[in-house]
Amino acid sequence: MIRQEVLHAVLDPKAVHFKQFWLSSVDRDESELLEVLCFGNYGDLNAIQSCEEWKDAIESKLRTLTLLGLCEVPSELEYDQAMASCCIPDDVILEQRMVELQAQVHFQLDSVGRRIKVLRCLGARDIYNGERPLLLLRDAARSRESTLAGLRQWKQKLQYQLR
């Protein structure tokens, strides 16, 4: 049984962090849903077997979370890449989704060039640190190890540029 506060968070368009719910979850269906919301992407939507009555809300949330994840790294994002990752059918819907992320991401849309220039990403997706076993996902794209590896690469790049 999915807790009411979890459902409210899924339905809240501004909510992007679900790890606190995942860590305290004891229900298998709820844990699977929260695992995908925390660490999965739009492509993992079909892994969730329960929650049919909220499928549209969950699908919408995963699109938003996947876009946020794409904005964490690059300074420029092609429309085609974002649309393919989130299964978004047209430019207008993509631009609407980006506007929904304004509190998390500062960006400029280039509708003609079909690019999103990420100026600053204020939010980030949840990070998996092995707190409990994953039930559905083979591995989490954003884990402690991958975050540390990215920081080490960034440090080396900065050190190289300063030489």
Curated annotation (Swiss-Prot):
Q: Where in the cell is it found?
A: Cytoplasm; Nucleus
Q: What is its main location?
A: cytoplasm
Its GO biological process terms?
A: cellular response to pheromone; conjugation with cellular fusion; protein deneddylation
Query: Which domain of life does the protein's organism represent?
Result: Eukaryota
Entries under InterPro entries matching the protein: Csn9_fungi
Q: Which Gene Ontology cellular component annotation is one that this UniProt entry carries?
A: cytoplasm
Looking at the record, the residues that make up the PCI domain are 5-120
| Subunit details | Component of a COP9 signalosome-like (CSN) complex.
Cited function: Component of the COP9 signalosome (CSN) complex that acts as a regulator of the ubiquitin (Ubl) conjugation pathway by mediating the deneddylation of the cullin subunit of SCF-type E3 ubiquitin-protein ligase complexes. The complex is involved in the regulation of the mating pheromone response.
Q: Which protein is depicted?
A: COP9 signalosome complex subunit 9
